[in-house]
Each structure stands twice: as structure tokens, then as C-alpha cells.
Amino acid sequence: MSRFFIGLFVFLLTGNGFAQQLATARDTITVIENGKTLKMPWANGINYSNASNLDVNYDGIKDLVLYDRVNHINTGRFRCFIKTGPAGSTTYSFAPELSYYFPTVYNWGVFYDYNCDGREDLFCSTNSGIKVFRNEGTPANPVHFVLFKTILMSDYNPGATPFMGNIYASPVGVPGITDVDNDGDLDILGFSSQGVFIEYHQNMSKELYNTCDSLVFEYRDYCWGKFSESSCGISLNQCSPAPPAVFNSTNIDGKTYHNGACLTCLDSDGDGDKDLILGDISCNHVQYAYNIGTASAALIGDSTMMYPNFPAKNNTTRIQLNIFPCAYYVDVDGDNKKDLIATPSAFGSENYKSVWYYNNSSNTSTVNFQFVKNNFLQEEMIEVGQNAFPLIMDENADGKPDLLLGTYGFYTGNTLVSRLTLYRNIGSLSQPVFSLITQDYAALSAQGLFHLIPSAGDIDNDGDIDLVMGNSTGQIHWLENTAGAGNPCNFTVFKNNPFGFTTSSAEAAPQLYDIDLDGKLDLLIGMKNGRIAYYRNTGTAATPGYSLITNTFGNVNVQGNPSIYGIDGYAVPYFFNDGAGTKLLVGSISGTIFYYDVPANIAQNFVLVNPSVNNYNEGAQSAPFFVDVNNDGKRDLFLGNAGGGLSFFSSASPFVSLQEVDGTTLDQKVSIYPNPTSGQLNVQINALEFESVCLQVFDMSGRALNQVKSDANEFSVDVRELPAGLYMLKLQIKNKATQREVYKKVLKTE
């Protein structure tokens, strides 16, 4: 399989029979920061991640997969970064098309090879425990995981009548998954029922079956290493006397669980036993626990050798993040020596410099971690901290669209500070190039606001573009442009809540848009509850004034699944006119984008056309901006998310799709099988009259490879000569009146 896919995004705007589909590479717009061209600018940002090695594209080189979680939401997204440079380098490319196919995971997810087949499997959080997905990927189908264990169990009474209970794992933090006893299978270390001791669950796969392909655990030690951890400190020589060997359901259910910890297991001195790096939810540093015992009888005998400045060896920088730092023992530079990545695991910590990379410079079996950078991977992407809210406007009046980003906040000095970040277009109308100008546009950080979401429009009728911004409290602020018509923006006047209202739900996401067509810009405000408030401009063209019409405009509601997201929705609206009427995209807490048709009578309910127009969710708290940025007459999509980064999807694509007016999709009437295929594809068109069909095969960059024409409802296509990989089929189905098109992905295997 190719090392490098070009990302594909399917974006359907369906109304009056028409749907537009966007497909593009992520890097079709160049982004420059401080004179450096970013390698993966549209990689969505990173906040609080679990890091693992995984050969995602089956080229024999271990890549990096991050499971990135954002703020208070327990759902995250996998981000795949493909190792592209030689051994010893840290060059990676973003592979969004591979990121889409992982199982849905909550709280945390890490990869370890439990069955010794060379493919890392997925260990992840489930209710009070650990769930496991087996990796069954192949070069032709690289990201394919099958549920293996719904929850890992252990025998808490080994050697006698079995007493089975789940291995507890907090949803906050990550257990230690490693071969403790050096027998070739994976064991588990995790904080015990007392919350301060570490339990050891031994995997008996080797002992029972002489193979490592099972996960059969026995409870071996209630106090592995004979130490306790509490209040950001380690106490030695603990755990005496031992508790009863047999637990009953009462004291299992009554466990006082640890609030949250990350356990990183490694043999730091090459003596054959496991040492620990511990991260704690109440601490701003990690703790190092040195094992002076053996693999069979662990004894933590020194926690001061490098603590509290771990890994401050040879004057390197200590791991210190504001809240809950966790360490991950992974090979970053491909030299077959594991390095260290540290990231926070809780909201309220570093968010735009939150991936700390320590290179293992040791040439022996010991480790020597040397600090390299605190923004690994993030330095190559647009990264504005917590959340990104895109706005396209001509900031310097040169006729080219620039990019302005709002954010919930940059982590600075133990607090979050909201700012606006400006990328100016130094390219051309047809080929934008965004260059970072400032991360504190108009010095808005001085206002001490949170969750700044900008919208642009001339609300005082003086010929220049003003900014309004919503914030976390539900108020709207006005940044007045005093430059005058045709001049670069000059925002010198900040007006704090000049319109004198606060929305009924917090986190105001405003858009200036003349929804009632009276020539004045109204305020349409998305809110935390998933609704949109309509404030009509009842002032004059030169002196705006806003009156609340409704807090449930169009009856729009983008609340997520309450069992996951509670009562929140985080609506971020984008109204636009496509020539046939007003349409609405709404970003949401779940990351999906809702698409509505707005009736001419705006007092009526809007028509929900599609509750998930982006087939591939880019991350929680999506924020769409849909505008023609490359002057080709077609709208392009900028999509912000809670990770503090952006995705970009261009309209410049050969892929266009139609949908029938009656709601039955053409896609549903076309079958392609078998899929995957190793040689022949069969095409079947059902319940549809047509004169001819033309089928084209494209690779994922949009390059046409093959073409077949037919007038039959069933025909075949020979694809034996194509290399293994992912392809797109485009079917043009014609009759006398119309030509309609449909797209299908197919997987070619060897």
C-alpha cells in the first residue's frame, strides 16, 4: 500500500435534488509560520493525547497514533501520523483517511500487541475496566479492529475456587500494560481498590497454553512494588499486612478507586524488571519509581534518584505540565529505541504546546531521556490551543481572503486566555497561501475573555468590516473598524457588550447575516444548549440595535447523545445563500455538521436535510465556515474543532454527486461487489431507467485510471492490474433529460 494517501472527505449538501461532494488533499493551501512552511497544517490540532506506536500503513515502520481527547468530553479521535523520514528523524505526515476507521473509544486508548502477531491491538476504556480490540489489519485493509474482550476479567482467588471480577481501570488515566514477568505475554498493573496501591494481574496465557494469544489473568499482588502513591508523593515499604486473599462482591463494589493515574512501565536500567513513571491527576509533574527488586518480586526502593525532577538527567528539562502529565514510552525517531512523549491528560493544562518529546540518547540497555521540544507534531500544524473557530475575511483590503481564528483559549501562565489569530493571504486569489501574522490580533487577550468566536460584517454602514465576538458568558462584543472603506482593518475600539443582552444559554457563537432581507445585519447566535437565538437588527443601518425574536430559531437543535454529552450541544451556525435560497450548516458538540434548508418564511421550522453531512467526523465541537477561498466559484469548507486546529476541504475535485428529490439516493440504487476485491468488480443498478452508464476508476488523488461504458443494468470491471489500495469509482448515469453521478469507494487487495 502507498505510504501516503490523499485524504478524502465526503460532504453532502442535499436540497432540491442537488448535493455537492468535496474531496481534497489536506495540504492544498500552504500555511507559513515564522518563515517556515508547515508540513501538515490542516491536522486538526492536539490537546490531551495517549500516544502509541502502530504500523498504520503496513510499510514495516512504526508510526504514531494519538488518541486525542478534548476538554470535558469523554470522547476523542484517533490521529494517525505516518513516519516518513529515515531512522533517526522525526518527520511525520498526517493521514486523516486512516484515522476514520478506528473503533469508537471513550476516555483513553493505547496500542499493545497482546497476541505476538506483530500488530498492535487496541486496549481502551470501558465501564470500570479495560476493553480490547484485536488488530486484524492487512496491507490492503490496514485499519481493521475486531472486538476481542468486552471487559478484561481476573481470577481474584487463584489456586482455589475461582472468583472472577473485572480488572479495574479508571476512565481517567491509563493502566500499565506490559510483560511484568518476562514470559512473553502482557500483564497489567493498575491502582487497587484502596486507591494508593498497585495491583498486579498476571497473564496466564503462556503458563496455560504456551502461547501469548490469550488474555487470562490471575490476581497476584495487591501491592506491587510495596509502595503507595498519594498526594503527589511515593511512600516506600508499605502494604503490610496483606488483605484477605478472597474478595466478595461487597468489597469489590465498595472499592475506593484512585481518582486518576497513568502508569508507564519500562526497564530504565536494563536489569530485567519494570520501573514506573507515574502521572497523577492532582499533580503537575510525574513521579519516578525505581525497582530494586526482580521481575517476580518487585520492590520500589528509590523514588528520589530523579524525582521530583524526572527525567532531569544531564540538566534536561523536567516534565512539568499544569494538570495531570502522563508519559508514553514509544519510538519517535525510528531508531528502535523507545523515547518518551509526555502530554497532559486533563482539561486546564497546556494545549498548544502539549506534546513534549524526549529523545532516548542512550547507547546501552538503559535510558537517557533528553528534552527536544514541547510542541512535537503541533509545530507542523495550525494550533490555537483549545477550540478553533474559523473566519474568512479580507483583513488588509488587498482583495484576497485572509484567515482569522477565534479560540476558547491558549494556556498561558496557569490560565486560559482567549485571543484571535491572524493568517494573512500572501498568495493569490486562486492559490491562497496563509502566513501567520499574530496570535493576538487587536490585543484582545487584554480583555480577559473566554471562548471568543468571531463574525465579520459592516454593522455601522461606514464601508468597512467590523467584528463581533461571542464569549463564554453569552455576551456579544463589538470590535469596531475605524479604517474606512477600502483600507486595511484598524480595530481600535473595543465595545464590551454594547447591545446589552446575554443569551439564554452560554458560549455564544454569533453570525452576522441579514436573515430577514431588510438590508441590515441580524445576529444569529449558536448556544451551548444546541439552539440558535435570533436577534433581529431593529436599529438603523448606521446604529445597530438588536431585539430577541426567539431562542429556538427554526427549531434547530444539535444536542448530542445525552449519555455522552449531557445536555450540551454547542451550536455554531453558518448561514449562506446558494442561489436557490438560504441554507444553514451547524457545528455541534459531537463533531457532526447538521444541514438545514431555511424556508422563505423564517418563522417556520427549518427543514433538517442531513443530520451528519460530514461522513468523517473531524472532532468534537465542530465549527464550519463555508466560503469560496480560491476564486473558482465554488465554496470550500474550513472546519474547526475543539483540538484547536483546522481541517480544510476544497471544492476543486472531480467528485460530484446528486440525490433524487424523493429522498431515495442514487447511491442506494447502485451496488458494487465484491468489495474488497482482488480482481473483478460487479456493478448492479437497480430500479432505475437510464440510457447509458460510464464508470471511471480514480485513485485517491483524483487521477483517472480506467473507464468502462455500458447500457446494461449489470456489468463487470477488471481491476486485476491495479495495485492494492483504496480507489474511487465514479458512475455517470445518463438518460435523455439528466445526467446523474454516484461515487463508491472500493478496496483492491492482492
Predicted segments, located by residue:
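Positively charged n-region of N-terminal signal peptides that target proteins for export
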Residues: 1-4, 748
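Compositionally biased regions
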Residues: 3, 171, 429, 506, ...
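Sec-dependent N-terminal signal peptides
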Residues: 4-13
